[in-house]
Protein backbone atom coordinates (compact mmCIF):
# COMPACT_ATOMS: atom_id res chain seq x y z
CA UNK A 1 0.00 0.00 0.00
CA UNK A 2 1.42 3.36 -0.99
CA UNK A 3 0.92 6.09 1.57
CA UNK A 4 1.27 9.54 0.06
CA UNK A 5 3.20 12.23 1.86
CA UNK A 6 5.75 9.77 3.23
CA UNK A 7 9.04 11.71 3.25
CA UNK A 8 12.30 10.34 1.97
CA UNK A 9 14.15 12.01 4.83
CA UNK A 10 13.47 14.66 7.40
CA UNK A 11 16.80 16.35 7.62
CA UNK A 12 19.02 15.76 10.61
CA UNK A 13 19.54 19.42 11.29
CA UNK A 14 15.81 20.06 11.25
CA UNK A 15 14.94 17.40 13.78
CA UNK A 16 18.03 17.16 15.93
CA UNK A 17 19.54 20.60 16.03
CA UNK A 18 20.12 20.60 19.75
CA UNK A 19 23.79 19.72 19.44
CA UNK A 20 26.32 20.25 16.71
CA UNK A 21 27.65 16.72 16.52
CA UNK A 22 26.27 13.32 17.43
CA UNK A 23 27.25 9.77 18.13
CA UNK A 24 24.95 6.83 17.44
CA UNK A 25 24.55 4.29 20.23
CA UNK A 26 22.70 1.01 20.04
CA UNK A 27 19.86 0.50 22.51
CA UNK A 28 20.84 -1.23 25.73
CA UNK A 29 18.45 -3.37 27.74
CA UNK A 30 18.34 -1.53 31.04
CA UNK A 31 15.82 -3.74 32.83
CA UNK A 32 16.56 -6.95 34.65
CA UNK A 33 16.24 -10.08 32.57
CA UNK A 34 12.67 -11.20 32.10
CA UNK A 35 11.83 -14.46 33.84
CA UNK A 36 10.64 -16.54 30.90
CA UNK A 37 10.03 -19.47 33.23
CA UNK A 38 7.10 -17.84 34.95
CA UNK A 39 3.66 -19.18 34.18
CA UNK A 40 1.84 -17.92 31.09
CA UNK A 41 -1.87 -18.66 31.19
CA UNK A 42 -3.40 -19.92 27.93
CA UNK A 43 -6.18 -18.18 26.05
CA UNK A 44 -9.68 -19.61 26.02
CA UNK A 45 -11.33 -19.52 22.61
CA UNK A 46 -15.08 -19.00 22.27
CA UNK A 47 -17.28 -18.94 19.21
CA UNK A 48 -16.42 -15.27 18.64
CA UNK A 49 -13.04 -13.86 19.70
CA UNK A 50 -11.37 -10.46 19.63
CA UNK A 51 -7.78 -9.22 19.51
CA UNK A 52 -7.73 -5.62 20.73
CA UNK A 53 -5.11 -2.88 20.68
CA UNK A 54 -5.51 0.73 21.75
CA UNK A 55 -3.44 3.80 22.56
CA UNK A 56 -0.34 2.48 20.82
CA UNK A 57 1.03 6.06 20.62
CA UNK A 58 3.76 5.15 18.17
CA UNK A 59 5.38 2.28 20.09
CA UNK A 60 5.26 0.01 17.03
CA UNK A 61 8.99 -0.64 17.17
CA UNK A 62 8.64 -2.22 20.60
CA UNK A 63 10.13 -1.29 23.95
CA UNK A 64 13.78 -1.68 23.04
CA UNK A 65 14.95 -1.50 26.66
CA UNK A 66 12.29 -3.69 28.22
CA UNK A 67 12.05 -7.38 27.37
CA UNK A 68 8.51 -7.63 28.70
CA UNK A 69 7.16 -5.49 25.84
CA UNK A 70 9.92 -5.78 23.26
CA UNK A 71 7.98 -7.21 20.31
CA UNK A 72 7.68 -4.90 17.32
CA UNK A 73 4.70 -4.67 15.00
CA UNK A 74 6.33 -7.13 12.62
CA UNK A 75 6.27 -9.77 15.34
CA UNK A 76 2.75 -8.66 16.21
CA UNK A 77 1.77 -9.20 12.57
CA UNK A 78 3.15 -12.74 12.73
CA UNK A 79 1.14 -13.23 15.92
CA UNK A 80 -2.03 -11.89 14.27
CA UNK A 81 -1.65 -14.09 11.20
CA UNK A 82 -0.93 -17.18 13.30
CA UNK A 83 -3.97 -16.42 15.44
CA UNK A 84 -6.12 -16.10 12.32
CA UNK A 85 -4.84 -19.51 11.24
CA UNK A 86 -5.69 -20.94 14.66
CA UNK A 87 -9.20 -19.50 14.48
CA UNK A 88 -9.77 -21.19 11.13
CA UNK A 89 -8.37 -24.45 12.46
CA UNK A 90 -10.70 -24.30 15.48
CA UNK A 91 -13.66 -23.30 13.33
CA UNK A 92 -14.40 -20.06 15.21
CA UNK A 93 -14.43 -16.33 14.45
CA UNK A 94 -11.61 -13.90 15.27
CA UNK A 95 -11.83 -10.14 14.78
CA UNK A 96 -8.99 -7.62 15.18
CA UNK A 97 -9.90 -4.17 16.50
CA UNK A 98 -7.97 -0.97 17.28
CA UNK A 99 -9.48 1.97 19.14
CA UNK A 100 -7.24 4.90 18.31
CA UNK A 101 -4.42 7.21 19.43
CA UNK A 102 -1.77 6.01 17.00
CA UNK A 103 0.87 8.65 17.77
CA UNK A 104 2.19 11.22 20.28
CA UNK A 105 4.51 9.20 22.47
CA UNK A 106 7.41 7.76 20.48
CA UNK A 107 10.00 8.96 17.99
CA UNK A 108 8.76 6.54 15.34
CA UNK A 109 5.47 8.44 15.21
CA UNK A 110 6.43 11.93 16.32
CA UNK A 111 9.67 12.70 14.50
CA UNK A 112 7.90 12.91 11.13
CA UNK A 113 6.12 15.94 9.72
CA UNK A 114 3.22 15.68 10.08
CA UNK A 115 3.35 13.31 13.00
CA UNK A 116 2.14 9.77 12.49
CA UNK A 117 2.76 9.20 8.79
CA UNK A 118 5.31 6.42 9.38
CA UNK A 119 3.27 4.69 12.07
CA UNK A 120 0.06 5.06 10.07
CA UNK A 121 1.78 3.30 7.21
CA UNK A 122 2.96 0.50 9.52
CA UNK A 123 -0.62 0.02 10.72
CA UNK A 124 -1.78 -0.61 7.16
CA UNK A 125 0.29 -3.82 7.10
CA UNK A 126 -1.86 -5.35 9.86
CA UNK A 127 -5.06 -7.37 9.21
CA UNK A 128 -7.36 -5.21 11.34
CA UNK A 129 -11.08 -5.76 10.78
CA UNK A 130 -12.37 -2.59 12.46
CA UNK A 131 -10.66 0.60 13.67
CA UNK A 132 -11.75 3.89 15.16
CA UNK A 133 -10.36 7.34 15.86
CA UNK A 134 -8.66 8.72 18.98
CA UNK A 135 -8.39 12.25 20.27
CA UNK A 136 -4.69 12.38 19.31
CA UNK A 137 -5.73 12.16 15.68
CA UNK A 138 -7.51 15.51 16.10
CA UNK A 139 -5.29 17.95 18.03
CA UNK A 140 -3.52 19.26 14.94
CA UNK A 141 -5.18 20.07 11.62
CA UNK A 142 -2.24 18.72 9.60
CA UNK A 143 -2.48 15.34 11.35
CA UNK A 144 -6.25 15.19 10.93
CA UNK A 145 -6.01 16.04 7.24
CA UNK A 146 -3.24 13.52 6.58
CA UNK A 147 -5.04 10.76 8.46
CA UNK A 148 -8.33 11.44 6.69
CA UNK A 149 -6.79 11.73 3.22
CA UNK A 150 -4.26 8.90 3.23
CA UNK A 151 -4.92 6.51 6.14
CA UNK A 152 -8.70 6.19 6.36
CA UNK A 153 -9.25 5.18 2.68
CA UNK A 154 -6.97 2.16 3.08
CA UNK A 155 -9.56 0.49 5.32
CA UNK A 156 -12.39 0.57 2.78
CA UNK A 157 -15.10 1.71 5.17
CA UNK A 158 -13.97 -0.20 8.26
CA UNK A 159 -12.28 2.82 9.88
CA UNK A 160 -15.17 4.24 11.89
CA UNK A 161 -15.64 7.74 13.26
CA UNK A 162 -19.36 7.84 13.91
CA UNK A 163 -19.39 11.20 15.70
CA UNK A 164 -16.43 12.96 14.02
CA UNK A 165 -16.51 15.10 10.88
CA UNK A 166 -13.85 17.04 9.00
CA UNK A 167 -13.89 19.99 6.62
CA UNK A 168 -12.76 18.87 3.16
CA UNK A 169 -10.82 20.91 0.60
CA UNK A 170 -14.08 22.59 -0.44
CA UNK A 171 -14.68 23.62 3.18
CA UNK A 172 -17.63 21.27 3.42
CA UNK A 173 -18.17 18.95 6.37
CA UNK A 174 -17.93 15.25 5.67
CA UNK A 175 -17.53 12.16 7.81
CA UNK A 176 -13.97 11.60 9.03
CA UNK A 177 -14.54 7.85 8.71
CA UNK A 178 -17.52 5.59 8.36
CA UNK A 179 -20.57 6.05 10.56
CA UNK A 180 -21.13 2.32 10.72
CA UNK A 181 -20.33 -0.90 8.93
CA UNK A 182 -22.35 -4.09 8.62
CA UNK A 183 -20.84 -7.50 7.98
CA UNK A 184 -21.40 -11.19 8.55
CA UNK A 185 -18.56 -13.11 10.20
CA UNK A 186 -17.22 -16.35 8.74
CA UNK A 187 -19.51 -18.22 11.08
CA UNK A 188 -22.67 -16.31 10.39
CA UNK A 189 -22.86 -13.62 13.07
CA UNK A 190 -24.58 -10.59 11.52
CA UNK A 191 -22.67 -7.68 13.02
CA UNK A 192 -23.33 -3.95 13.05
CA UNK A 193 -20.27 -1.95 14.15
CA UNK A 194 -20.04 1.72 15.10
CA UNK A 195 -17.07 3.71 16.40
CA UNK A 196 -17.19 6.70 18.73
CA UNK A 197 -14.88 9.24 20.33
CA UNK A 198 -15.60 10.55 23.81
CA UNK A 199 -17.05 14.06 24.11
CA UNK A 200 -13.79 15.73 23.11
CA UNK A 201 -13.56 19.51 22.73
CA UNK A 202 -9.85 20.26 22.20
CA UNK A 203 -9.80 19.26 18.53
CA UNK A 204 -8.38 21.51 15.82
CA UNK A 205 -10.87 23.78 14.08
CA UNK A 206 -10.91 21.68 10.89
CA UNK A 207 -12.83 18.91 12.68
CA UNK A 208 -16.12 18.63 14.54
CA UNK A 209 -16.84 16.16 17.33
CA UNK A 210 -20.54 15.61 17.99
CA UNK A 211 -21.31 14.70 21.62
CA UNK A 212 -22.34 11.07 21.86
CA UNK A 213 -25.65 11.96 23.48
CA UNK A 214 -26.44 14.17 20.46
CA UNK A 215 -25.32 11.55 17.94
CA UNK A 216 -27.68 9.04 19.52
CA UNK A 217 -30.63 11.25 18.55
CA UNK A 218 -29.57 11.54 14.91
CA UNK A 219 -31.59 9.96 12.14
CA UNK A 220 -28.78 7.73 10.88
CA UNK A 221 -28.14 6.31 14.35
CA UNK A 222 -31.79 5.63 15.05
CA UNK A 223 -32.11 3.89 11.70
CA UNK A 224 -29.14 1.66 12.49
CA UNK A 225 -30.22 0.58 15.97
CA UNK A 226 -33.73 -0.20 14.73
CA UNK A 227 -32.48 -2.72 12.19
CA UNK A 228 -33.83 -6.23 12.63
CA UNK A 229 -31.01 -8.07 10.86
CA UNK A 230 -28.40 -7.73 13.63
CA UNK A 231 -27.07 -10.57 15.81
CA UNK A 232 -24.37 -8.48 17.52
CA UNK A 233 -23.90 -4.76 18.05
CA UNK A 234 -20.16 -4.07 18.10
CA UNK A 235 -19.42 -0.70 19.70
CA UNK A 236 -15.80 0.36 19.52
CA UNK A 237 -14.56 3.69 20.73
CA UNK A 238 -11.85 5.81 22.22
CA UNK A 239 -13.72 5.97 25.50
CA UNK A 240 -12.75 4.36 28.84
CA UNK A 241 -14.95 1.36 29.53
CA UNK A 242 -15.65 2.31 33.15
CA UNK A 243 -17.68 5.23 34.52
CA UNK A 244 -18.28 7.04 31.23
CA UNK A 245 -21.75 8.23 30.31
CA UNK A 246 -20.97 7.95 26.60
CA UNK A 247 -20.93 4.15 26.80
CA UNK A 248 -23.85 4.04 29.19
CA UNK A 249 -25.96 6.12 26.81
CA UNK A 250 -25.02 4.05 23.77
CA UNK A 251 -25.71 0.80 25.61
CA UNK A 252 -29.07 2.04 26.91
CA UNK A 253 -30.20 3.30 23.49
CA UNK A 254 -29.66 -0.16 21.99
CA UNK A 255 -30.88 -2.22 24.92
CA UNK A 256 -34.23 -0.40 24.95
CA UNK A 257 -34.80 -1.47 21.34
CA UNK A 258 -33.12 -4.89 21.48
CA UNK A 259 -33.53 -6.42 24.95
CA UNK A 260 -31.73 -9.64 24.05
CA UNK A 261 -29.19 -8.78 21.35
CA UNK A 262 -25.54 -8.98 22.48
CA UNK A 263 -23.72 -5.66 22.70
CA UNK A 264 -19.93 -5.89 22.70
CA UNK A 265 -17.90 -2.82 23.70
CA UNK A 266 -14.18 -2.24 23.09
CA UNK A 267 -12.76 0.99 24.52
CA UNK A 268 -9.62 3.00 25.11
CA UNK A 269 -8.11 6.32 26.19
CA UNK A 270 -7.41 5.74 29.90
CA UNK A 271 -4.28 3.65 29.23
CA UNK A 272 -5.23 0.75 31.49
CA UNK A 273 -6.10 -2.91 31.27
CA UNK A 274 -9.77 -3.20 32.15
CA UNK A 275 -12.88 -5.30 31.71
CA UNK A 276 -16.28 -4.01 32.80
CA UNK A 277 -19.76 -5.53 32.85
CA UNK A 278 -22.86 -3.81 31.44
CA UNK A 279 -25.38 -6.67 31.55
CA UNK A 280 -25.72 -10.42 30.96
CA UNK A 281 -25.13 -9.98 27.21
CA UNK A 282 -22.89 -6.93 27.19
CA UNK A 283 -19.34 -6.53 28.48
CA UNK A 284 -16.44 -4.23 27.65
CA UNK A 285 -12.69 -4.60 27.25
CA UNK A 286 -9.84 -2.09 27.25
CA UNK A 287 -6.45 -3.34 26.12
CA UNK A 288 -3.91 -1.10 27.84
CA UNK A 289 -1.47 1.19 26.06
CA UNK A 290 1.91 1.73 24.35
CA UNK A 291 2.16 -1.77 22.83
CA UNK A 292 2.49 -3.22 26.31
CA UNK A 293 -0.74 -5.19 25.98
CA UNK A 294 -2.80 -7.14 23.49
CA UNK A 295 -6.36 -7.42 24.74
CA UNK A 296 -8.17 -10.74 24.27
CA UNK A 297 -11.90 -11.37 24.62
CA UNK A 298 -13.96 -14.44 23.79
CA UNK A 299 -17.73 -14.89 23.67
CA UNK A 300 -19.43 -18.27 23.88
CA UNK A 301 -23.07 -19.27 23.77
CA UNK A 302 -23.95 -17.16 20.72
CA UNK A 303 -27.03 -18.77 19.22
CA UNK A 304 -26.51 -16.82 15.99
CA UNK A 305 -23.08 -18.37 15.40
CA UNK A 306 -22.75 -21.57 13.41
CA UNK A 307 -19.39 -22.17 15.10
CA UNK A 308 -19.37 -25.07 17.53
CA UNK A 309 -20.02 -24.08 21.12
CA UNK A 310 -16.67 -24.15 22.97
CA UNK A 311 -18.02 -24.31 26.53
CA UNK A 312 -15.54 -21.85 27.96
CA UNK A 313 -15.83 -18.75 30.07
CA UNK A 314 -18.27 -17.66 32.69
CA UNK A 315 -21.55 -15.77 32.68
CA UNK A 316 -22.13 -12.36 34.20
CA UNK A 317 -23.40 -12.86 37.75
CA UNK A 318 -23.33 -10.35 40.58
CA UNK A 319 -20.78 -7.90 39.22
CA UNK A 320 -21.43 -4.18 39.55
CA UNK A 321 -22.98 -2.95 36.31
CA UNK A 322 -21.76 0.00 34.27
CA UNK A 323 -25.17 0.37 32.62
CA UNK A 324 -27.96 2.71 33.58
CA UNK A 325 -30.59 1.12 35.87
CA UNK A 326 -34.03 -0.19 34.88
CA UNK A 327 -33.07 -1.45 31.43
CA UNK A 328 -34.44 -4.70 29.98
CA UNK A 329 -32.51 -7.76 31.11
CA UNK A 330 -31.28 -10.10 28.35
CA UNK A 331 -33.02 -13.46 28.56
CA UNK A 332 -30.04 -15.56 27.47
CA UNK A 333 -26.72 -14.91 29.22
CA UNK A 334 -23.48 -15.28 27.32
CA UNK A 335 -20.17 -16.70 28.52
CA UNK A 336 -17.03 -14.56 28.46
CA UNK A 337 -13.27 -14.82 28.97
CA UNK A 338 -10.64 -12.08 28.81
CA UNK A 339 -6.88 -11.94 28.88
CA UNK A 340 -4.27 -9.19 28.83
CA UNK A 341 -1.31 -10.47 26.80
CA UNK A 342 2.16 -9.08 27.46
CA UNK A 343 3.47 -7.63 24.19
CA UNK A 344 6.53 -9.82 23.66
CA UNK A 345 7.67 -12.54 21.31
CA UNK A 346 7.70 -15.27 23.96
CA UNK A 347 4.04 -14.74 24.86
CA UNK A 348 3.07 -14.44 21.21
CA UNK A 349 4.78 -17.75 20.49
CA UNK A 350 3.10 -19.41 23.46
CA UNK A 351 -0.41 -18.38 22.46
CA UNK A 352 0.09 -19.31 18.81
CA UNK A 353 1.64 -22.66 19.78
CA UNK A 354 4.74 -21.99 17.69
CA UNK A 355 8.41 -22.70 18.22
CA UNK A 356 11.12 -20.08 17.87
CA UNK A 357 11.81 -21.33 14.35
CA UNK A 358 8.19 -21.60 13.19
CA UNK A 359 6.66 -18.44 14.67
CA UNK A 360 7.70 -15.78 12.16
CA UNK A 361 5.75 -15.28 8.96
CA UNK A 362 7.37 -13.78 5.83
CA UNK A 363 4.97 -10.83 6.10
CA UNK A 364 5.94 -10.20 9.71
CA UNK A 365 9.66 -10.40 9.00
CA UNK A 366 9.24 -7.94 6.14
CA UNK A 367 7.38 -5.48 8.35
CA UNK A 368 10.12 -5.64 11.00
CA UNK A 369 12.57 -4.65 8.25
CA UNK A 370 10.32 -1.74 7.27
CA UNK A 371 10.20 -0.55 10.88
CA UNK A 372 13.99 -0.70 11.17
CA UNK A 373 14.34 1.29 7.96
CA UNK A 374 11.91 3.92 9.22
CA UNK A 375 13.88 4.23 12.46
CA UNK A 376 17.04 4.73 10.41
CA UNK A 377 15.31 7.30 8.18
CA UNK A 378 14.27 9.25 11.28
CA UNK A 379 17.74 8.86 12.84
CA UNK A 380 16.25 7.69 16.11
CA UNK A 381 19.60 6.35 17.33
CA UNK A 382 20.94 9.92 17.61
CA UNK A 383 22.06 10.75 21.17
CA UNK A 384 21.68 14.00 23.13
CA UNK A 385 23.48 12.58 26.14
CA UNK A 386 23.62 9.65 28.54
CA UNK A 387 21.63 9.65 31.77
CA UNK A 388 23.77 8.54 34.75
CA UNK A 389 20.95 6.90 36.74
CA UNK A 390 17.22 6.20 36.65
CA UNK A 391 14.67 8.91 37.45
CA UNK A 392 11.26 7.37 38.03
CA UNK A 393 7.74 8.57 37.34
CA UNK A 394 5.55 6.45 39.64
CA UNK A 395 7.86 3.95 41.32
CA UNK A 396 9.02 6.44 43.98
CA UNK A 397 7.54 9.40 45.83
CA UNK A 398 7.52 12.64 43.79
CA UNK A 399 9.74 14.12 46.53
CA UNK A 400 12.36 11.35 46.30
CA UNK A 401 15.83 12.16 45.00
CA UNK A 402 15.37 9.72 42.12
CA UNK A 403 11.96 11.08 41.13
CA UNK A 404 11.68 12.68 37.71
CA UNK A 405 9.35 15.28 39.22
CA UNK A 406 11.93 16.39 41.78
CA UNK A 407 14.52 16.54 39.02
CA UNK A 408 12.17 18.78 37.05
CA UNK A 409 11.42 21.12 39.96
CA UNK A 410 15.01 21.35 41.24
CA UNK A 411 16.90 21.41 37.95
CA UNK A 412 15.17 21.05 34.59
CA UNK A 413 12.58 23.81 34.92
CA UNK A 414 14.85 26.48 36.48
CA UNK A 415 18.00 25.61 34.51
CA UNK A 416 16.54 25.16 31.03
CA UNK A 417 13.66 27.62 30.95
CA UNK A 418 15.75 30.76 30.84
CA UNK A 419 14.72 34.06 29.27
CA UNK A 420 17.82 36.24 29.02
CA UNK A 421 15.77 39.43 29.08
CA UNK A 422 13.95 38.44 32.29
CA UNK A 423 16.45 36.17 34.03
CA UNK A 424 17.10 38.68 36.82
CA UNK A 425 13.39 38.90 37.68
CA UNK A 426 12.15 36.48 40.36
CA UNK A 427 9.74 34.05 38.76
CA UNK A 428 7.68 30.99 39.45
CA UNK A 429 7.41 28.22 36.86
CA UNK A 430 4.26 26.12 36.72
CA UNK A 431 4.17 22.84 34.83
CA UNK A 432 1.99 19.73 34.85
CA UNK A 433 2.84 16.26 36.06
CA UNK A 434 0.47 14.68 33.57
CA UNK A 435 2.68 15.82 30.71
CA UNK A 436 5.32 13.33 31.81
CA UNK A 437 4.63 9.98 30.15
CA UNK A 438 7.39 7.83 31.61
CA UNK A 439 10.64 7.52 33.52
CA UNK A 440 14.14 8.59 32.47
CA UNK A 441 16.31 5.49 32.42
CA UNK A 442 20.06 5.24 32.78
CA UNK A 443 21.79 5.19 29.42
CA UNK A 444 21.50 6.94 26.09
CA UNK A 445 18.82 9.59 25.59
CA UNK A 446 17.82 10.46 22.04
CA UNK A 447 14.74 11.63 20.13
CA UNK A 448 12.96 8.33 20.78
CA UNK A 449 13.34 8.71 24.55
CA UNK A 450 12.46 12.39 24.33
CA UNK A 451 9.10 11.73 22.70
CA UNK A 452 8.45 8.78 25.02
CA UNK A 453 8.98 11.08 27.98
CA UNK A 454 7.00 14.03 26.65
CA UNK A 455 5.37 14.00 23.18
CA UNK A 456 3.56 17.35 23.38
CA UNK A 457 5.03 19.47 20.60
CA UNK A 458 2.24 22.04 20.92
CA UNK A 459 3.02 22.79 24.58
CA UNK A 460 5.10 25.93 25.22
CA UNK A 461 6.09 27.95 28.27
CA UNK A 462 4.51 31.40 28.34
CA UNK A 463 4.58 34.08 31.01
CA UNK A 464 2.83 37.09 32.49
CA UNK A 465 5.30 39.71 33.76
CA UNK A 466 5.22 41.54 37.06
CA UNK A 467 2.34 39.82 38.80
CA UNK A 468 1.91 40.81 42.46
CA UNK A 469 3.42 37.98 44.48
CA UNK A 470 0.50 37.93 46.88
CA UNK A 471 -1.59 36.59 43.98
CA UNK A 472 1.06 34.56 42.19
CA UNK A 473 1.89 32.51 45.28
CA UNK A 474 -1.69 31.21 45.40
CA UNK A 475 -1.74 29.84 41.86
CA UNK A 476 -0.16 26.51 42.74
CA UNK A 477 -2.80 25.58 45.29
CA UNK A 478 -5.63 26.85 43.07
CA UNK A 479 -4.47 24.86 40.05
CA UNK A 480 -3.57 21.78 42.05
CA UNK A 481 -6.92 21.81 43.82
CA UNK A 482 -8.92 22.01 40.65
CA UNK A 483 -9.14 18.24 40.37
CA UNK A 484 -8.03 15.24 42.34
CA UNK A 485 -4.73 13.58 41.69
CA UNK A 486 -4.84 11.26 38.73
CA UNK A 487 -5.65 7.65 39.43
CA UNK A 488 -2.37 5.78 39.66
CA UNK A 489 -3.88 3.03 37.51
CA UNK A 490 -3.81 5.50 34.62
CA UNK A 491 -0.03 5.48 34.84
CA UNK A 492 0.87 1.82 34.95
CA UNK A 493 3.84 2.26 32.68
CA UNK A 494 6.51 -0.35 32.10
CA UNK A 495 6.79 -1.21 35.77
CA UNK A 496 9.09 -3.92 37.00
CA UNK A 497 8.06 -6.65 37.13
CA UNK A 498 4.66 -6.07 35.53
CA UNK A 499 0.94 -5.51 35.54
CA UNK A 500 -1.35 -6.92 38.21
CA UNK A 501 -4.85 -6.18 36.94
CA UNK A 502 -8.10 -6.23 38.88
CA UNK A 503 -11.31 -5.92 36.86
CA UNK A 504 -14.97 -6.94 37.05
CA UNK A 505 -14.10 -10.61 36.57
CA UNK A 506 -11.39 -10.63 39.24
CA UNK A 507 -7.60 -10.68 39.21
CA UNK A 508 -6.82 -13.52 36.80
CA UNK A 509 -6.89 -11.57 33.53
CA UNK A 510 -3.15 -11.02 32.99
CA UNK A 511 -1.74 -13.79 30.85
CA UNK A 512 1.56 -13.64 32.75
CA UNK A 513 1.62 -13.72 36.54
CA UNK A 514 3.46 -10.63 37.76
CA UNK A 515 4.53 -9.38 41.15
CA UNK A 516 2.53 -6.36 42.26
CA UNK A 517 4.46 -3.09 42.33
CA UNK A 518 3.17 -0.22 44.44
CA UNK A 519 2.97 3.09 42.60
CA UNK A 520 2.73 6.73 43.58
CA UNK A 521 0.23 9.21 42.20
CA UNK A 522 1.42 11.67 39.59
CA UNK A 523 1.13 15.27 40.83
CA UNK A 524 -1.23 17.52 38.93
CA UNK A 525 0.98 20.59 39.19
CA UNK A 526 4.71 21.20 39.57
CA UNK A 527 6.14 24.54 40.68
CA UNK A 528 9.68 25.90 40.78
CA UNK A 529 10.66 29.23 42.34
CA UNK A 530 13.64 30.93 40.73
CA UNK A 531 15.61 34.02 41.76
CA UNK A 532 13.92 34.55 45.11
CA UNK A 533 15.68 36.41 47.92
CA UNK A 534 16.06 34.11 50.91
CA UNK A 535 15.25 36.87 53.41
CA UNK A 536 12.17 38.54 51.94
CA UNK A 537 9.44 37.89 49.40
CA UNK A 538 9.41 39.94 46.19
CA UNK A 539 6.67 42.46 45.49
CA UNK A 540 6.10 41.13 41.98
CA UNK A 541 7.19 38.07 40.02
CA UNK A 542 6.97 36.73 36.51
CA UNK A 543 4.50 33.86 36.30
CA UNK A 544 5.83 31.28 33.82
CA UNK A 545 3.43 28.51 32.89
CA UNK A 546 2.81 25.79 30.37
CA UNK A 547 0.25 26.99 27.84
CA UNK A 548 -1.81 23.96 28.88
CA UNK A 549 -2.69 26.01 32.00
CA UNK A 550 -3.16 29.35 30.25
CA UNK A 551 -6.94 29.72 30.53
CA UNK A 552 -6.92 28.56 34.14
CA UNK A 553 -4.06 30.89 35.10
CA UNK A 554 -5.81 33.92 33.61
CA UNK A 555 -9.09 33.01 35.26
CA UNK A 556 -7.46 32.43 38.65
CA UNK A 557 -5.60 35.75 38.61
CA UNK A 558 -8.67 37.71 37.54
CA UNK A 559 -10.74 36.04 40.22
CA UNK A 560 -8.22 37.01 42.88
CA UNK A 561 -8.06 40.67 41.81
CA UNK A 562 -11.83 40.67 41.32
CA UNK A 563 -11.72 42.20 37.84
CA UNK A 564 -10.54 41.28 34.36
CA UNK A 565 -7.02 42.64 34.32
CA UNK A 566 -5.15 39.72 32.80
CA UNK A 567 -5.94 38.74 29.22
CA UNK A 568 -4.14 37.09 26.31
CA UNK A 569 -2.54 40.46 25.56
CA UNK A 570 -0.51 40.05 28.75
CA UNK A 571 0.84 36.65 27.72
CA UNK A 572 4.18 36.20 25.93
CA UNK A 573 6.27 33.12 25.21
CA UNK A 574 8.97 32.84 27.87
CA UNK A 575 11.33 30.13 26.64
CA UNK A 576 12.32 30.82 23.04
CA UNK A 577 15.06 29.08 21.06
CA UNK A 578 16.50 30.43 17.84
CA UNK A 579 16.01 27.07 16.13
CA UNK A 580 12.33 26.98 17.11
CA UNK A 581 12.74 23.83 19.20
CA UNK A 582 11.21 25.29 22.32
CA UNK A 583 8.18 23.09 22.94
CA UNK A 584 8.12 21.01 26.09
CA UNK A 585 9.80 17.82 24.75
CA UNK A 586 12.94 19.75 23.84
CA UNK A 587 13.24 21.04 27.40
CA UNK A 588 14.24 17.53 28.47
CA UNK A 589 16.57 17.05 25.50
CA UNK A 590 18.37 20.32 26.21
CA UNK A 591 18.84 19.44 29.87
CA UNK A 592 20.32 16.04 29.00
CA UNK A 593 22.57 17.64 26.41
CA UNK A 594 23.91 20.38 28.66
CA UNK A 595 24.29 18.27 31.80
CA UNK A 596 25.05 14.72 30.68
CA UNK A 597 26.56 14.75 27.20
CA UNK A 598 29.93 13.74 28.68
CA UNK A 599 28.46 10.62 30.32
CA UNK A 600 28.50 8.80 26.97
CA UNK A 601 32.29 8.46 26.98
UniProtKB/Swiss-Prot annotation:
Signal peptide extent: 1-24
GO biological process: adenosine catabolic process; nucleotide catabolic process
Cellular compartment(s): Membrane
A single GO molecular function term of this UniProt record: 5'-nucleotidase activity
GO cellular component terms attached to this protein's record: cell surface; cytosol; extracellular region; membrane
Keywords: Membrane, Signal
First-listed, main subcellular location of the protein, grouped into a coarse class: membrane
Any matching Pfam family: Metallophos
The name this protein goes by in its record: Uncharacterized protein C1039.02
Organism: Schizosaccharomyces pombe (strain 972 / ATCC 24843) (Fission yeast)
Amino acid sequence: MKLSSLPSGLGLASLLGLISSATAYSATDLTTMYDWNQIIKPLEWGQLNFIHTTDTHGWLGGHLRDARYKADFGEFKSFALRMKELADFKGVDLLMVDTGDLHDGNGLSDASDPQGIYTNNIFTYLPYDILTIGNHELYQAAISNNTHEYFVPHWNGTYLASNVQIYNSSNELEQFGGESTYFITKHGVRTLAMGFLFNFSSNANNTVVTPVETAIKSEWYQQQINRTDVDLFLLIGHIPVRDYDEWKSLHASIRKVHPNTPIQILGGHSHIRDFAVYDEASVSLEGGRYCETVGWLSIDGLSASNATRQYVGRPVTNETRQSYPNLPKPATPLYYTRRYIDFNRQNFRFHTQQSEDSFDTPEGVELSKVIKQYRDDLNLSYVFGCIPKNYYMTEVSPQAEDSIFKLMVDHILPEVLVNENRSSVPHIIISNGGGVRGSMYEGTFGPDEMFQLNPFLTNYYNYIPDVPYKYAKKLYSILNGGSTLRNVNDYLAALNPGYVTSDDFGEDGDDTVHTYVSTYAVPNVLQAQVGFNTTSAPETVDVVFLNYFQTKVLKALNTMVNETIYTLSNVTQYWVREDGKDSSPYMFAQYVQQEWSDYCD
